Amino acid sequence: MIFLILTMAMGIFSAETAHTINRNAEDKIQYVNGADVIVAEDWAERAFGTAGVDDAEIVFTEPDFTKYHDMDEDALMTKVLYRGNVGIAGASSIKSSLLGINTKEFGEVANMKDGLLSEHWYHYLNAMSQDPEGVLVSTSFRDELGYKLGDRISFRENNSDTIRGVIYGFVDYWPGMTPPEAGEDGTSYFIIANLSLVQMKWGVQPYEVWMKNLGDSSQYIYDFAEKYEISFQKFVDTNADLIDLKNDPVFQGTNGVLTVGFIVVLVLCSVGFLIYWILSIQSRALQFGIFRAMGMTMREVLSMLFNEQLFISGVSIAAGVGVGKLASKLFVPMIQMAYSSAEQIIPLEIQTAANDTMKLYIVVGVVMIVCMVILGWMIKKIKIAQALKLGED
């Protein structure tokens, strides 16, 4: 029983540990990137004003956006304005990130893991869409600066016009934004505003184009760049990042250690299980001889042995699954201790590998069948007459 309990427990623990590491690493990449594909072109700019004056107005020339419609059959897309150094009125020492979005398009394109917010993030987008001045801010504005729902917040970048918004919600997480707990000092300031509001105050500013793949591949963006001979200032391909993750030596090594560890335990436990039953059958040769002398057929003897195995092994497998689940619940969360808060980004979530667990059951089942075949063959090889004579002596 101990052999089977150890095998099942180690298998469950290894499967859930590997699946948790893999899935959370993928979720982190998708969250940090924000979308399947992100590109930004170089914008031509000209300064207007008196020479040598710092506050000269800068006018940007927007690249032709209509060419992106060539990819309408391959991806959904939206314009996203990102600024990383926005000042907050009344808090001169605070610098915030700003994300200007079109709420409907952003909801269709961005990647956001379920369960990170108290409500589905679509509810926050719906709230923003009701008011052009509606903004969402990180919880650091509430916890550190005392802002409340419905308060007005003013922000600006360098010498640009001040934008005033109304706070419609506080969020810890948002696609592409660093959450407060991942900040260097436990705080992170970011503002999510309507792109129309930002452009009305600041004019047309360089923006990024976020895309969501309609298929499994992102090859279309490479074909697009080659067709128009574009060298992007910023280029993010989440699919490529996920492939790089899976090819990472440390990542592969971790998965390899877990897999090899389970295989070694499976082999050792299977050999131990088989040795135990071989010795058990050899010591019960007289008992099997008596059963045959009582009129039991070989089929009935094998059926009895099968039922014995079924009940003993069934209890062991159930106990092993319970021990494995308990060990996963207690020790898998300790994985996050290996990462600093800045690397963690989003909370670690224990993942149950249903497919891997089913494979484990199949492997253990095959091992059990092989062992039963070997044991059945050994029982048939027992010389019943010799066993009975041994009993008479």
Indicate residue ranges for each PLM-predicted region.
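Alpha-helical transmembrane segments
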Residues: 6-36, 278, 327, 331-336
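Small-residue transmembrane helix packing/gating motifs
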Residues: 32, 129, 173-216
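N-terminal Sec/SRP start-transfer signal
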Residues: 1-8, 280, 297, 303-306, ...
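Short helix-loop junctions at transmembrane helix boundaries
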Residues: 251, 257, 318-386
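A short beta-strand structural signal in non-transmembrane regions
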Residues: 36-42, 141-142, 199-234
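Interfacial "coupling" helices/loops that link adjacent transmembrane helices in transporter permeases
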Residues: 272-313
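Peri-transmembrane interface segments
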Residues: 222-269, 280-283, 304
